[in-house]
Amino acid sequence: MTSIEPTHTGKKVIVGMSGGVDSSVSAYLLMQQGYQVEGLFMKNWEEDDNNEYCAAAEDLKDAQAVCDKLGIKLHTVNFAAEYWDNVFEYFLAEYKAGRTPNPDIMCNKEIKFKAFLEFADEILDADYIAMGHYVRRRDNSDGSTQMLRGVDGNKDQSYFLYTLSHEQVARSLFPVGELEKHEVREIAKEMGLITHDKKDSTGICFIGERKFTEFLGTYLPAQPGNIETPEGEVIGTHQGLMYHTLGQRKGLGIGGMKNSNDDPWYVVDKDLERNVLIVGQGGHHPRLMSTGMTVNQLHWVDRTGPVDGCHIAVKTRYRQQDVPCTLTYTDEHTLRVVFDEPVAAVTPGQSAVFYDGEVCLGGGIIDQLIRG
């Protein structure tokens, strides 16, 4: 491997060590660049400490092994109370209200780049923090800092980080954002790090590998209701609207309906007042398509945001292709977004994240859908 000339001698970086390959390689790369590196492992969930689904003990063991291999300190911190108050209660409240939240975005906002940064500052005297996220930062000549998409388009995580301020971005380093995922694994293998072939974590961290309905049912009571077609025909029952999201195809239990064509059934709407799940056939059913949306709880990385009437790109879910759109401010907290072409399965409660080329501008929460 080509060695990197150290350029940051003396600057202290606290790396969020998750026990995964991305944070492992981030720590190694920062050491190569001359930073004084220490690790910090966060414990954010305590409900499953004695449960088969909890991977925290194994992750801590892997993080410690990597730090031992690299010859750096590993600190630990418990943010379970902050996580419960600021992430999990939000998650439950949104589902209870019939929306589909994204707790990973809230975790980045409240824990990884707030509680973690404060702890690194106040307790560990850090100059920077670092995470294994696939994004990049750009320091401009005017002193501003921007967040860019990661080089690996399939792994780019800017969608999950749009709530960061430019001050937080300026305090953060993202070494693997400049690399493809396969390069990260190759570096880890070359350095003999035990995480080099560790499986990437998927899904919501506190749910782990268990079934979503089983998990959510322990915190929110089931509210069964009817499944109807857009025409009002009752064709089945559901256990709770919270278990379903727009565009969902699997797990509806209504396959093989008589008098229907062979197209699969999709969730196309939720009637919250009647507690009815509305389904239609085909992934481009008219009720599933939106021509636009309103977005509130706006956050812009540079605090100012795009200008009124501009034509830029938006993602309404992770790994979605960029959707060209036009923005209009209805007030300082709300945007009306009109897509160039109709988009399927835009989901209230999820985040809409806006881009100008490679730059992640920020975003907000999808509130209302515009149809027709």
From Swiss-Prot:
Protein name as catalogued: tRNA-specific 2-thiouridylase MnmA
EC class: transferase
Alphabetized GO MF terms: ATP binding; tRNA binding; tRNA-uridine 2-sulfurtransferase activity
UniProtKB keywords: ATP-binding, Cytoplasm, Disulfide bond, Nucleotide-binding, RNA-binding, Transferase, tRNA processing, tRNA-binding
Family classification: Belongs to the MnmA/TRMU family.
Residue segments, region Interaction with tRNA: 155-157, 317-318
Principal subcellular localisation of the protein: cytoplasm
GO BP terms in the entry: tRNA wobble position uridine thiolation
Localisation: Cytoplasm
EC number: 2.8.1.13
Alphabetical list of Pfam families matching this protein: tRNA_Me_trans (PF03054), tRNA_Me_trans_C (PF20258), tRNA_Me_trans_M (PF20259)
Chain positions of site Interaction with tRNA: 133, 350
